[in-house]
């Protein structure tokens, strides 16, 4: 009985740990996209409109087991250089399509927005998620503000 109780407590915590680990892997992967955007901004004085202009592969080719795609979007505004990092799966309630075990993050999109530097400052990145999951602890603390991911 004690083993059953311990298992009932430990299993959900372990599953949450696994999801957070997958999110961290996705955050590490997006660093290469950030670097390409920063280089483009340094050379052209503005943010790229899309992956091609940034010298990156197509969004679906920037992927991993835990990332469906990474798309550069300007939203028609060259002052905006957002990266949209889409997680695989389906976010529709009741849908069982979560092939990578991302839980509430399946099918959601995390956005990374650069802060335009003043003079020679380094570029800072804001992170946000618009389709906020019910399990917000799965999202890194720095990404829990949905407004920081939009222009």
Describe each PLM feature range.
Residues 1-34:
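N-terminal single-pass transmembrane signal-anchor helix
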Residues 28, 32, 36, 49, ...:
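Charge-rich, low-complexity amphipathic helices
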Residues 42-151:
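Periplasmic/extracellular, small/polar-rich flexible segments of pilin-like filament-forming proteins
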């Amino acid at each position: 009985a004690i083993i059953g109780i311990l298992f009932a407590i430990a299993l959900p915590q372990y599953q949450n740990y696994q999801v957070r680990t997958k999110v961290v892997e996705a955050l590490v992967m997006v660093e290469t996209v950030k670097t390409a955007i920063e280089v483009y901004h340094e050379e052209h004085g503005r943010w790229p409109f899309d992956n091609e202009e940034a010298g990156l592969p197509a969004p679906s080719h920037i992927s991993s087991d835990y990332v469906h795609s990474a798309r550069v979007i300007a939203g028609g505004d060259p002052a905006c250089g957002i990266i949209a990092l889409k997680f695989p799966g389906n976010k529709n309630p009741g849908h069982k399509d979560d092939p990578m075990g991302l839980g509430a993050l399946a099918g959601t999109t995390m956005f990374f927005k650069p802060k335009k530097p003043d003079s020679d400052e380094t570029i800072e990145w804001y992170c946000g998620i618009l389709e906020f999951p019910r399990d917000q602890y799965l999202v890194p603390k720095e990404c829990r503000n949905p407004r920081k991911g939009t222009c």
